[in-house]
Amino acid sequence: MTTVPPTRDTAAIRIWLSIVAGLIALMVLVGGATRLTESGLSIVEWKPVTGTLPPLSEQAWSDAFEAYKTIPQYRQMNAGMTLHEFKTIFWWEWAHRLLGRVIGMVYLLPFLWFLWRGAVSGPLGRRLWLIFGLGALQGAVGWWMVASGLTERTEVAPVRLATHLSLALLIFASIVWTLRRLKPRDEAEVPGRLRLTAWALVGVTFVQLYLGALVAGLRAGLVYNTWPEIDGGLIPAAANLWAHAPWWINLFENHLTVQFMHRMTAYTLLALAAWHAFDVMRAGAGRDAVRGAHRLLAAILVQAVLGIATLLMVVPISLALLHQGTALIVLTFAVLQAERLSPRRVAAVAVPQAAVAAGQAG
């Protein structure tokens, strides 16, 4: 065993981080709904403190609506929208921003408490400070994303949307990793190739989630709604894949290219997960590793089916959100498997010396 027995602080930290991870997952889903309902530009100002409260009077609602009318999205897409219709999209964006504020407080206040108690130090302390820094950065990235749709565009820039989501998922994955590190386990002796494929699965999952965000940002799921064919074949014509100049712009703005990359990465992820599950069993890596590999493979299979159904049904909101939620499960299982197969060399949490002694005696 490479970690000391859990202490009261360890259990409290795990509960705290589990709540934060759950809130982040909820925020990702609310963010997805905000995008799918085209609500993300309904609040055109960034007021971190005073923006916590929604409009509380008819005049305040009228002012918020008039501010929305000044941006291109209203003029080009929603001209004639009623105040009642505006309120519908406003509440999605307001809820998304409110969740961000709540997550900030739920993370910061207990973190300060644990710091005051001396319960976090060393690798754990550094990791928690890093997560805090990423969370602060995420707020700035969120406004950077929204600002891209307030001048000439009628929606936020897809690359900025994908960056915003990817940073949220990085924070989520970091918390999942930390939670797993705080749970004692036996050190497993496994071949290095298993660790390599486990980490490759994490990397490919992140790439796939980024591409999925690009698909959503471009509304690329509303076109090429056939499977397994795309644009008339299994592989689109090169002239269509690279239709824009310079060539690299197709990787971010060509609907066909982005959707094709999303499909190909899904196939790659599924094949890699299947190979990893087989290799873990062949190597005799232990029951936990085998179960983890099988859970990950099953989640990816479900996610693939949901993705195909979402495409064929032309992106119904409920199915698209289920697809996004399952992506979080895939990421969770991938991170857990990578941690499960990674060595632990030091204790993950600061504990009293008495606990260390008790662990050694046991």
Swiss-Prot record:
Complexes and interactors: Interacts with CtaB.
Protein name: Heme A synthase
One BP term from GO: heme A biosynthetic process
Amino acids binding heme: 262, 323
Gene: ctaA
Catalytic activity, as annotated: Fe(II)-heme o + 2 A + H2O = Fe(II)-heme a + 2 AH2
Function statement: Catalyzes the conversion of heme O to heme A by two successive hydroxylations of the methyl group at C8. The first hydroxylation forms heme I, the second hydroxylation results in an unstable dihydroxymethyl group, which spontaneously dehydrates, resulting in the formyl group of heme A.
Assigned GO CC terms: plasma membrane
Enzyme class: oxidoreductase
InterPro entries: COX15/CtaA_fam, HemeA_Synthase_type2
Membrane association type: Multi-pass membrane protein
Keywords of this entry: Cell membrane, Heme biosynthesis, Iron, Membrane, Metal-binding, Oxidoreductase, Transmembrane, Transmembrane helix
Family, as annotated: Belongs to the COX15/CtaA family. Type 2 subfamily.
Segments crossing the lipid bilayer: 11-31, 102-122, 128-148, 159-179, 198-218, 264-286, 297-317, 318-338
Subcellular location, principal: membrane
Any one Gene Ontology molecular-function term assigned to this protein's record: metal ion binding
EC number, UniProt record: 1.17.99.9
Compartment annotation: Cell membrane
Short name of one Pfam family: COX15-CtaA
Cofactor needs: heme b
Keyword Metal-binding: yes
Pathway in which this enzyme or protein is active: Porphyrin-containing compound metabolism; heme A biosynthesis; heme A from heme O: step 1/1
